[in-house]
Amino acid sequence: MRKGVPKDPEIADLFYKDDPEEIFVGLHEIGHGSFGAVYFATNSHTNEVVAVKKMSYSGKQTNEKWQDIIKEVKFLQQLKHPNTIEYKGCYLKEHTAWLVMEYCLGSASDMLEVHKKPLQEVEIAAITHGALQGLAYLHSHCKIHRDIKAGNILLTEPGQVKLADFGSASIVSPANSFVGTPYWMAPEVILAMDEGQYDGKVDVWSLGITCIELAERKPPLFNMNAMSALYHIAQNDSPTLQSNEWSDSFRGFVDYCLQKIPQERPSSADLLRHDFVRRDRPPRVLIDLIQRTKDAVRELDNLQYRKMKKILFQETRNGPLTESQEEEEDSEHGSNLSRKMDSLGSNHSIPSMSVSTGSQSSSVSSMQEVLDESSPELVMMHSDESTVNSTSSVVQKKDHVFIRDEVGHRDRRPEVRPTQSVQNQALHYRNRERFATIKSASLVTRQIHEHEQENELREQMSGYKRMRRQHQKQLIALENKLKAEMDEHRLKLQKEVETHANNSSIELEKLAKKQVAVMEKEAKTAAADEKKFQQQILAQQKKDMATFLESQKKQYKLCKEKIKEEMNEDHSTPKKEKQERISKHKENLQHTQAEEEAHLLSQQRLYYDKNCRFFKRKTMIKRHELEQQNIREELNKKRTQKEMEHAMLIRHDESTRELEYRQLHTLQKLRMDLIRLQHQTELENQLEYNKRRERELHRKHFMELRQQPKNLKAMEMQIKKQFQDTCKVQTKQYKALKNHQLEVTPKSEHKTILKSLKDEQTRKLAILAEQYEQSINEMMASQALRRDEAQEAECQALRLQLQQEMELLNAYQSKIKMQTEAQHERELQKLEQRVSLRRAHLEQKIEEELAALQKERSERIKFLLERQEREIETFDMESLRMGFGNLVTLDYPKEDYR
């Protein structure tokens, strides 16, 4: 994707497709920062006044800048609250994002710069209350601003407080990035990479620092190097309000915000219930403050405009002003401004605790507006009268007119054209009157100038922030990589466990199927054996019955023949009676044989049933033995599988333990490497800062040395003038004395007296000349000594300050190193405890599973034996009911059924 032409539809939807240069007109720069510039503009379609923040995403770190823009746009789109800046849209134009927001008059910081004194406590309370409401809204949606300061708290014409500049904001809470402005950073943000995450309470800390800023014009440690301030904040106690004249409620509020430990620090919602922001205050307190500030800004701009106008007139007519004229102009207007500022400004009695850099460098020599070059001979005339159009929030001048310089037509000399920079400045101050603001033109100019001058320091700080963020990204990337590796490892182990469980289940299913097949086979075999056994018995009984019938038949024949023989021998019995007796004897014999046959059949049936019953009992016992064998085989298989599973789990635990220790070592090694790199960078930055400060001091001393001859010449001229005055006095005295002596002495002695007086005059002048030379020499020596002493004192003070900052850096780095080592030790102990606890849980689980398996084994075997015992008992009871008696002792030949 080429930046500026996003191909991702989701990203493309964040930006409007229109050309911003056609929509927004009349752009005037009203602010400047590391991101770029903020402009006042008018929407040509709706005539709405807006603020345009231009952010370039070309050059170095293009992708990082682009991602920051996307993040800020997404963040702004989600905001909808009276105390957050209203988002209007974002446009892309030639690798520059035009972020359009509602226009505000300026920031709380601008008020401090305009009035050059702290705000009143009631004004601070009103601003803080509005900022807190915005923060509470952000924090309730798990968002963090991360760059709260007076410069990012804006005010609108009706006195509404707005949070702005969400370039450092975090959409998620907690976060762990090193972002923000050094002097306002909370300790946990500075230590974010070293100690972990932070939440919305970092904004509460920054708000407390902002309260001190509004009360003392500058945040704590502002006179310190920004890097050194970071080290100071990270390891020293929280700052407090310096003056005792503030109320206890305000002091308590600031102390409450600046609790060092985040857990003890209140949330933004808690602070909204604090007496400092809840107490009564005039409803128009901010509106009045804004109006006073606007009046003061207008007076400042008018003063600068009059200066530029006079320079224009002077350059047009006679060339540049002399230095003395400039000083007179400055002193005159300065005294007027001072008197007016005293009447307009805040009347708080607390003095400023630090010197504003703005008061030292309110230069107007680098204004960037362009004067219309088509009228080089025109001179602007300015009226002091102005009105504020409250409906359009635009301040308009009544009497801006142009007249032609008549002097230029009368004077035939070549005219001197005003310099372009002076024209630019004059038009800049004139054009500013077209919109309402509480930021003076000199402040805008100074911001631009400082942005250009402090590029090296800003690059160093941004490079340091970038390095910290890069380190954080490296740690997060490594953590994600290690987490992915651990997840992959655990997934692999889980698959192995699942594979083992599946294989075990399959093996048990196979075993169950095999046992079922064996049981079915045994059942079929038993049924076949039983059938064969029955057939054998029946065949034998059939054979026995045939033998028995044959025997009966033979016996019947024998008996019949025997009876016949007996009857034949008995001749006395009648034949009829013999026949009857033979028939009866046959019947008896047949009856006896029938009874014997029936008895044999009964014996055979009993034998058959009893032996079949006994065979069934043996078959059942054999089946029981097979069931016992099967359950023992199944339980043994389960135990073997469980033991294999336990061995695998122990192996997994050991491999996981080894991986965890290796990953912890890798993470800690990277963290220590990054800390060493960070400390090395911090040391290099500090050394570079020290060299820069020494160079600046050396340059200052060199300039003083170059300036020294001029100063000495002036002082020498002053001494010479004093000498000349003394000489004149002595000459007058000599003349008076000479006249007096000539009048009171005879004329004959005049020559001697004149010679004597001449010698005395020569002697005194010689002494005076000697004194003059001695004064010159003493003055030069004194000035040189004073200069050397002052420069040496400055060098000594600088060395002491730099040494203290270096010691502060060393202490900070030592603390960070000790904290990191302690953190690593805690992580190692935590890992050891986790590993030990996990191993104990695993061993307990193994023990419990083995006990459960043994219990299952005992219960299943017991249940099987009881079932089999009940089955045999039921079978034997049924056998008894069938009259078979005890079948256990039945052991006789199959043929012995009689």
From Swiss-Prot:
Its main location: cytoplasm. Pfam families: Pkinase. It comes from the Eukaryota. GO terms for biological process: DNA damage response; DNA repair; MAPK cascade; mitotic G2 DNA damage checkpoint signaling; negative regulation of JNK cascade; neuron projection morphogenesis; positive regulation of JNK cascade; positive regulation of stress-activated MAPK cascade. CDD domains: STKc_TAO3. It is found in: Cytoplasm; Cell membrane; Membrane raft; Lipid droplet. It is an enzyme of class 2 (transferase). The keyword Membrane applies. ATP binds at I30, G31, H32, G33, S34, F35, G36, A37, V38, K53. It is a peripheral membrane protein. Residues 316-374, 565-596 are annotated as: Disordered. It catalyses: L-seryl-[protein] + ATP = O-phospho-L-seryl-[protein] + ADP + H(+); L-threonyl-[protein] + ATP = O-phospho-L-threonyl-[protein] + ADP + H(+). GO terms for cellular component: cytoplasm. GO terms for molecular function: ATP binding; protein serine kinase activity; protein serine/threonine kinase activity; transferase activity. Residues 24-277 form the Protein kinase domain. Keywords: ATP-binding, Cell membrane, Coiled coil, Cytoplasm, DNA damage, DNA repair, Kinase, Lipid droplet, Membrane, Nucleotide-binding, Serine/threonine-protein kinase, Transferase. Residues 452-502, 548-649, 754-875 form a coiled coil. Its EC number is 2.7.11.1. Residues 352-368 have a biased composition (Low complexity). Serine/threonine-protein kinase that acts as a regulator of the p38/MAPK14 stress-activated MAPK cascade and of the MAPK8/JNK cascade. In response to DNA damage, involved in the G2/M transition DNA damage checkpoint by activating the p38/MAPK14 stress-activated MAPK cascade, probably by mediating phosphorylation of upstream MAP kinase kinases. Inhibits basal activity of the MAPK8/JNK cascade. This is Serine/threonine-protein kinase TAO3. It comes from Gallus gallus (Chicken). The lineage of its organism: Eukaryota, Metazoa, Chordata, Craniata, Vertebrata. The gene is TAOK3.
